[in-house]
């Protein structure tokens, strides 16, 4: 896989994204995060969402697709794009789609429904843990 390094340790396979490891990453979204692009870009407000999310298999893809279908337009800035073209980058459903330079689920700072991940915001709205709603790569 281009851009990734995989290390097998018995039954466990560790997968590292080289660009992410070279980035200016700081892990508090919306609080001065420099983002994960090759150059610091806090003004974009993308945090770690610039590349979308690589999904951990078919089960996670099905879960994300099902949860996306429950998101209301007032809480999901790119609801129209998702309705028209789906939330996945392609037919393999292995990653989320990019819209305007970031993950389709990223509500931008100006969005009236709340900035940040639409899945994260929706989980909090119903009293559930965001980790149960988001792709695993987004919180591990």
Regions found by a protein language model. Give the residues of each.
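Hydrophobic scaffolds flanking metal-cofactor catalytic centers in soluble metalloenzymes
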Residues: 1-140
């Amino acid at each position: 896989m281009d851009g990734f390094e995989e290390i097998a340790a018995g039954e466990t396979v560790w997968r590292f994204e080289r660009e992410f490891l070279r980035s200016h990453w700081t892990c508090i979204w919306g609080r001065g995060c420099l983002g994960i692009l090759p150059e610091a870009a806090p003004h974009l407000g993308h945090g770690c969402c610039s590349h979308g999310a690589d999904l951990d298999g078919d089960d996670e893809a099905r879960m994300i697709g099902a949860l996306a279908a429950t998101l209301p337009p007032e809480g999901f800035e790119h609801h129209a794009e998702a309705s028209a073209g789906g939330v996945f980058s392609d037919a393999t459903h292995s990653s989320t789609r990019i819209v305007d330079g970031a993950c389709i689920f990223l509500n931008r700072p100006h969005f009236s429904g709340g900035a940040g991940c639409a899945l994260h915001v929706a989980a909090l709205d119903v009293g559930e843990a965001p980790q149960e709603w988001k792709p695993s790569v987004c919180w591990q």
